[in-house]
């Protein structure tokens, strides 16, 4: 394969990842199949970088003219519109299942139900409120830090979420599941590129902030995996969405705490 063909292949995989995780239209020439989607997992972090960057741009463009809370809300709205609330939906379904089911089978069945339950509604509401409040505090501390936090958190949280695919068992047997192709044949190349995208955005941060966030994310990933194993024996697409949302919120927490210390 020539260098040009290799670059074309990687761009193709990135566009597949973008089409999977966002509402941004893919070019007509991009063909999607299970093998491509599987390999595209290497670029899930970069998709987060794109979403975070666009959200940060909206925040930076409006923060001089609008109250911090409104600018943050607009930035969050951009993120939701770009992704279609994909991860938020997974968070709600996961909390409905984990909160309402007694056995792993019950939890998986509840998570499959498209209706929103009380546990999911509470989790979704609290998650959005937490993100808004934390970002407002970061914006009041330093608008540059708040915008950078959006970029870092959207990227790193997706790296944490997607990395679960490489070590854990996919527990749904439904062949029509949108996440089923991701559970097959993940390679070391996908993992290394995924991790590299997370390390890349840490350059936005100072040394202590970057190190603190890295250590917390490693610990959080381990904690999430332990919970998923105990609850359902592995992961589903919904739980990956929940992991992303939780990791994003924790990112904001860490950056706010470290920012106040510095």
From Swiss-Prot:
It is found in: Cell inner membrane. It holds the Pfam family CobS. It comes from the Bacteria. The chain crosses the membrane at residues 43-63, 66-86, 120-140, 146-166, 191-211, 242-262. Its EC number is 2.7.8.26. GO terms for biological process: cobalamin biosynthetic process. Pathway: Cofactor biosynthesis; adenosylcobalamin biosynthesis; adenosylcobalamin from cob(II)yrinate a,c-diamide: step 7/7. GO terms for cellular component: plasma membrane. Its cofactor is Mg(2+). Keywords: Cell inner membrane, Cell membrane, Cobalamin biosynthesis, Magnesium, Membrane, Transferase, Transmembrane, Transmembrane helix. GO terms for molecular function: adenosylcobinamide-GDP ribazoletransferase activity; cobalamin 5'-phosphate synthase activity. It catalyses: alpha-ribazole + adenosylcob(III)inamide-GDP = adenosylcob(III)alamin + GMP + H(+); alpha-ribazole 5'-phosphate + adenosylcob(III)inamide-GDP = adenosylcob(III)alamin 5'-phosphate + GMP + H(+). It is a multi-pass membrane protein. Joins adenosylcobinamide-GDP and alpha-ribazole to generate adenosylcobalamin (Ado-cobalamin). Also synthesizes adenosylcobalamin 5'-phosphate from adenosylcobinamide-GDP and alpha-ribazole 5'-phosphate. HAMAP family: CobS (MF_00719). NCBIfam families: cobS, PRK00235.1-3. Belongs to the CobS family. This is Adenosylcobinamide-GDP ribazoletransferase. It comes from Shewanella baltica (strain OS195). The gene is cobS.
């Amino acid at each position: 394969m020539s260098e040009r063909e290799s670059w074309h292949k990687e761009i193709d995989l990135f566009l597949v990842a973008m089409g999977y995780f966002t509402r941004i239209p893919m070019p007509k020439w991009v063909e999607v199949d299970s093998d491509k989607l599987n390999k595209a997992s290497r670029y899930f972090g970069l998709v987060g970088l794109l979403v975070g960057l666009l959200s940060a741009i909206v925040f930076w463009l409006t923060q001089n003219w609008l109250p911090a809370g409104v600018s943050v809300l607009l930035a969050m709205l951009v993120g939701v519109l770009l992704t279609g609330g994909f991860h938020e939906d997974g968070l709600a379904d996961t909390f409905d299942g984990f909160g309402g089911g007694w056995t792993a089978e019950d939890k998986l069945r509840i998570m499959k139900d498209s209706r929103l339950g009380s546990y999911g509604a509470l989790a979704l509401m609290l998650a959005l409120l937490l993100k808004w409040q934390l970002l407002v505090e970061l914006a009041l501390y330093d608008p540059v830090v708040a915008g950078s936090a959006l970029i870092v958190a959207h990227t790193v949280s997706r790296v944490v979420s997607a990395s679960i695919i490489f070590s854990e068992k996919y527990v749904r047997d439904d062949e029509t599941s949108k996440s089923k192709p991701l559970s097959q044949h993940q390679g070391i190349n996908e993992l290394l590129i995924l991790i590299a995208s997370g390390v890349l955005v840490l350059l936005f941060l100072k040394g202590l902030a970057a190190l603190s966030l890295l250590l917390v994310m490693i610990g959080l990933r381990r904690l999430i995996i332990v919970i998923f194993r105990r609850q359902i024996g592995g992961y589903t697409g919904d739980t990956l969405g929940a992991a992303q949302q939780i990791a994003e919120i924790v990112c904001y927490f860490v950056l706010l705490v470290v920012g106040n210390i510095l």
